[in-house]
UniProtKB/Swiss-Prot annotation:
Gene Ontology BP term (one): mismatch repair
Gene it is expressed from: mutS
Role played: This protein is involved in the repair of mismatches in DNA. It is possible that it carries out the mismatch recognition step. This protein has a weak ATPase activity.
SUPFAM superfamilies: DNA repair protein MutS, domain I, DNA repair protein MutS, domain II, DNA repair protein MutS, domain III, P-loop containing nucleoside triphosphate hydrolases
Molecular function GO labels: ATP binding; ATP-dependent DNA damage sensor activity; damaged DNA binding; mismatched DNA binding
Keyword DNA-binding tagged: yes
Protein name listed in UniProt: DNA mismatch repair protein MutS
Record-linked NCBIfam families: mutS1 (TIGR01070), PRK05399.1 (NF003810)
């Protein structure tokens, strides 16, 4: 409730602000948006604009900052990038239309997860708004994601927190909605900046079902796949409710909802994405030299966004993969069609985001112009994929399905061609959006606005001839408007139809009904012209919005075609092969190359062969640094991943047994914010692999156990290798400097040694980057140090120390060097000591469940409970 000392305007501001406490309120006052109180202070600092004051509140000046209305988008961009939410409050009536302050309403709240403006979005990246409902006793975790800028909407349930974390790393939400009665767990800290708390009631399954039924105008949600999942209903409903509340629109472009199932896609956790540099490189965090960076040669933004989705969620269905592969192969074999498709796609615009802005009433004339040009291209794309020479049956089924979505837009295309001008302005208020000749009323208003002066000149000549007054002139006066001026000498010739308006010293000013009518038309022509053009434009946009569902299907078809053509383009350009995927365990890659390193190498990339199967499941790789161990392992992982997207791969040939997850433990750094050392980070990531890897997984391990003492590190690395091989039974590549691990080849069936060839010449080494069977006999660490630029005195001394250590390791294994007493391995404190066995565990080990009757089993359960 406002203080009685507040002005009516400030009282109105405070009332509106109270309803939007988490936002900066852009309060429209004439040609400016003003911000007051704390909002003004925050905006002034973030935007580097002046902080002033206006009036007083409780005796203190009210802080105020403002931005011009015409510059709103520029300042809005800066605030959103800084993490703010902004509520835009407009004047809903002309000043003076009512007593008291002008009526104002918030027409939209702009948040990081609800952006649609081109200037606020990256064209080749999705902008997901995600809602999350944590697991409870009766339901699993649930996530829903919506890209408001494209209309993509899906949900899924997950059993474990690590699965939720992996999905969030895939989606990279711009904003994450959570219930306000839930305190985020530590694992969610990485998303703290984008959290938005919402009323827990909005996550209720029944409320979600009501919102979805109302939005989609259906009586059942069975076809969407979420009807049997209250958690899915809850997160979907929370998303839609939030978007309605912030956008103040019907969201007509959200025409569908799909339910994803985790088993349908390969699981890639955040560590894997980071280590394999799928989306961003580790050097500077940009897309350059990431997998996506080198694989994205898509023509359209829609294609680039879909490619990112495919790379971040590879398929598990071999049939679905083969369907994509067939289309890529057809495009490679039909070079003319493939080149023609790529050329036609250059004329296609971002149809998905156009439709979003059209549905939300934010479309510009050029959005509709881009839609027109895109629709004009569709018949050409259809013709390429359905050749008239009778060979259409040779076109793969996926391409034929895509082609079907390019039909059916002829009427809308014609309407856009007839109604829109050829050259379109950026802004509707600039005029000239509707084609000349389409609307007679608009044409008349344009003539009035454009040709008013010539009309008055013509009228002036006509009146002189009719009245015989040669000095008659039509002039404009600010106070009286247009009038005909007649000098005193010709007043006797003034006809009765002239109406006297003003007497002057040397004559009289007159008007006629015709001039009065024209004056009214002329003075309001510009305003009425813009109103008429806006009316016609909005009607056309509404026509488009009503066809959103079919247009979105066409947009998805364009994106899919673009990605498939992109795969064909890269395969041809870089000599990639089509991999054979199968349900077996064999991963066999002949002449494989790293898809990223190859593109940035100044010298020809050295290809390598690798084979993993049930007989040789764990490859232990030894060799010096810089020799190529890490490159090889990442290369194998990336080839496997690309194969599961349907793409061709950088190899001479490849057979890939289906992989459900890729795990990587490559490099590590301190987690200072989390209070974890490099070694703790390494062990945490390794533990995650040991708990979740299966025989269907591919595991990449690089230098386990480096962050502790030599013996501890060796022991851990040995135990980890054994566990993964014997318990997880995952297909594994394990690079290590612990040469002792090579003994596992003779101890465990299926473990085999690999090494990187090195050539020595005159105290120099040459890395051949070739992987061969066998174990390395030296680490060449000093050679690498010399290459890195260590002073010669240091490397010379290092060789002396190494020679001394090696000599005494052979002749005096218990001595560290000449003159030293035998040394024992120093005791290292451990975090966890072995605890005595639990009585309950001992009792449980004695129980044979196959020998118990139901009554005995129940009694055993009670005994165990008493022992806990």
């Amino acid at each position: 409730m406002s203080s009685p000392k507040q002005t009516p305007m400030i009282a109105q501001y405070l009332s509106i602000k109270a309803a939007h406490p988490e936002t900066l309120l852009f309060f429209r006052m004439g040609d400016f948006y003003e911000l007051f109180f704390d909002d003004a202070k925050q905006a002034a600092e973030a935007l580097n604009i002046a902080l002033t004051s206006r009036g007083k509140s409780e005796g203190e000046p009210i802080p105020m900052a403002g931005i011009p209305v015409h510059a709103r988008q520029t300042y809005l961009n800066k605030l959103i990038e800084a993490g703010f939410k902004v509520a835009i409050c407009e004047q809903m009536e002309p000043p003076g239309a009512s007593k008291g302050p002008v009526r104002r309403e918030v027409v939209r709240t702009v948040t990081p997860g609800t952006l649609t403006e081109e200037s606020l979005l990256s064209p080749r990246e999705n902008n997901y708004l995600v809602s999350y409902l944590p697991a409870a006793k009766r339901h699993p975790h649930a996530l829903a994601a919506l890209d408001l800028s494209t209309g993509e909407f899906f949900a899924l349930t997950l059993e474990r927190e690590d699965q939720v974390a992996a999905e969030l790393s895939r989606l990279e939400p711009a904003e994450l909605l959570i219930p306000d009665n839930w305190e985020p767990e530590p694992w969610l800290k990485g998303w703290k900046r984008c959290l938005s708390r919402r009323g827990s009631w909005s996550f209720d399954g029944k409320e979600g079902a009501r919102v979805l039924l109302e939005h989609f105008q259906v009586t059942s949600l069975e076809s969407f796949g979420v009807a049997d999942s209250p958690p899915c209903l809850g997160v979907c409903g929370a998303l839609l409710h939030y978007c309605r509340e912030t956008q103040k629109e019907a969201l007509s472009h959200i025409t569908g909802l799909s339910r994803l199932h985790q088993q349908e896609g390969m699981v890639l956790d955040e560590t894997c994405r980071r280590n394999l540099e799928l989306n961003y490189n580790l050097k500077d965090g940009s897309r350059k030299s990431s997998l996506l960076g080198v694989m994205d040669r898509c023509i359209t933004p829609m294609g680039s966004r879909l490619l990112a989705q495919w790379i971040n969620r590879p398929l598990q269905s071999l049939d679905a993969i083969a369907t994509r592969q067939e289309s890529v192969s057809w495009l490679r074999e039909n070079l003319v069609a493939y080149q023609d498709l790529r050329e036609r796609l250059r004329m296609v615009h971002d149809l998905e985001r156009f439709l979003s802005r059209i549905a939300l009433r934010r479309a510009s004339p050029r959005d509709l112009g881009g839609l027109r040009q895109t629709l004009q291209c569709l018949p050409q794309l259809y013709a390429i994929l359905t050749p008239a020479d009778g060979h259409s049956l040779a076109v793969p089924s996926l391409l034929r399905i895509l082609a079907d979505h390019f039909n059916g837009h002829e009427a809308l295309t014609k309407q856009l061609e007839q109604q829109l001008a050829d050259e379109l302005p950026l802004n509707l208020k600039e005029g000239e959006t509707i084609r000349l000749g389409f609307d007679q009323t608009l044409d008349t208003l344009r003539s009035l606005s454009r040709d008013g002066k010539s009309y008055l000149t013509k009228l002036e000549v006509e009146e002189r001839e009719k009245t015989g007054i040669p000095s008659l002139k039509i002039k404009y006066h600010r106070s009286f408007g247009y009038s005909m001026e007649v000098t005193k000498t010709h007043l006797d010739k003034v006809p009765p139809r002239y109406i006297q308006r003003q007497t002057m010293t040397n004559g009289v000013r007159y008007v006629t009904e015709e001039l009065k009518e024209y004056e009214e038309q002329l003075l309001t022509a510009e305003e009425r012209m813009l109103e008429r053009e806006q009316l016609l434009f909005e009607a056309l946009a509404e026509q488009v919005a009503r066809q959103a569902e079919t247009l979105q299907a066409s947009a998805r078809a364009i994106a899919t075609l673009d990605v498939l053509a992109n795969f064909a383009h890269i395969a041809e350009e870089r000599n990639y092969c089509r991999p054979l995927l199968h349900e077996g365990a064999v991963i066999e890659i002949n002449q494989g190359r790293h898809p990223v390193v190859e593109q940035f190498s100044d010298t020809p990339f050295v290809a390598n062969d690798i084979r993993l199967d049930n007989r040789q499941r764990t490859g232990l790789i030894t060799g010096p640094n810089m020799a190529g161990k890490s490159t090889l392992m990442r290369q194998v992982a990336l080839i496997v991943l690309l194969a599961h997207t349907g793409a061709c791969v950088p190899a001479g040939s490849a057979k890939i047994g289906r992989v459900d997850r890729i795990f990587t433990r490559v490099g590590a750094s301190d987690d200072l914010a989390g209070g974890r050392s490099t070694f703790m980070v390494e062990m945490t990531e390794t533990a995650h692999i040991l708990h979740h890897a299966s025989e269907r997984s591919l595991v990449i391990l690089d230098e386990i156990g480096r962050g502790t003492s030599t013996y501890d590190g060796l022991s851990i690395a040995w135990a980890v290798a054994e566990h993964i091989h014997t318990q997880c039974q995952a297909r594994t590549l394990f690079a290590t400097h612990y040469h002792e691990l090579t003994q596992l080849e003779s101890q465990l069936d299926g473990v085999f040694n690999l090494t990187v060839e090195v050539k020595e010449w005159k105290d120099q080494i040459l890395f051949l980057h070739t992987i061969v069977r066998g174990a390395a006999d030296r680490s060449y660490g000093i050679h690498v140090a010399q290459l890195a630029g260590l002073p010669r005195a240091v490397t010379r001394r290092a060789r002396e120390v190494l020679a001394d250590l090696e000599e005494h390791a052979v002749h005096h294994p218990d001595s560290m060097g000449q003159g030293h007493a035998p040394a024992s391995q120093p005791y290292q404190l451990t975090l966890f000591e072995d605890a005595p066995p639990s009585p309950a565990l001992l009792e449980l080990k004695r129980v044979d469940p196959d020998e118990l009757t139901p009554k005995e089993a129940l009694e055993a359960l009670y005994r165990l409970k008493e022992l806990l």
